[in-house]
């Protein structure tokens, strides 16, 4: 909840954190409120482009996005084509199911070597050169 997000963020800030990645829906709103109240720190949003969907855009470096629209589109297209299956859908960089939002207000503040490295890692993941595995994958 928002209160937990605010409390946890205040704890992280007191421990020297300067970037917070809240992962749990409304917790991010509490994080934004805490960052705003403290006048320091930034955050990385989750699920959607928080810059566009919250009041804390000026605090959001980027967002780790679930591109649910891609999954919905693919499912509808499979149904129309008669190829729909009940196999679990896993959103990946390759199938457009996940991604990073733009840096928006932080565009000029993120060092170019970091931007380049992130792009390089994304390309390596998509090509299969860098394999990311999870024991929780379906």
Regions found by a protein language model. Give the residues of each.
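A residue-level marker of the well-folded mature domains of exported/periplasmic proteins
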Residues: 1-138
């Amino acid at each position: 909840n928002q209160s937990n997000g605010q409390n946890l963020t205040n704890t992280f800030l007191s421990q020297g954190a300067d970037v917070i990645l809240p992962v749990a829906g409304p917790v991010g709103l509490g994080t934004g409120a805490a960052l705003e109240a403290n006048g320091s720190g930034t955050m990385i949003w989750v699920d959607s482009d928080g810059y566009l969907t919250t009041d804390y855009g000026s605090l959001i470096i980027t967002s780790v996005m679930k591109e649910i629209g891609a999954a919905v589109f693919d499912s509808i297209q499979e149904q129309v084509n008669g190829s729909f299956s009940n196999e679990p859908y896993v959103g990946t960089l390759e199938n457009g199911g996940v991604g990073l939002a733009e840096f928006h207000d932080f565009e000029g503040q993120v060092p170019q070597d970091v931007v380049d490295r992130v792009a390089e890692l994304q390309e390596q993941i998509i090509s299969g050169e860098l394999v990311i595995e999870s024991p929780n994958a379906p």
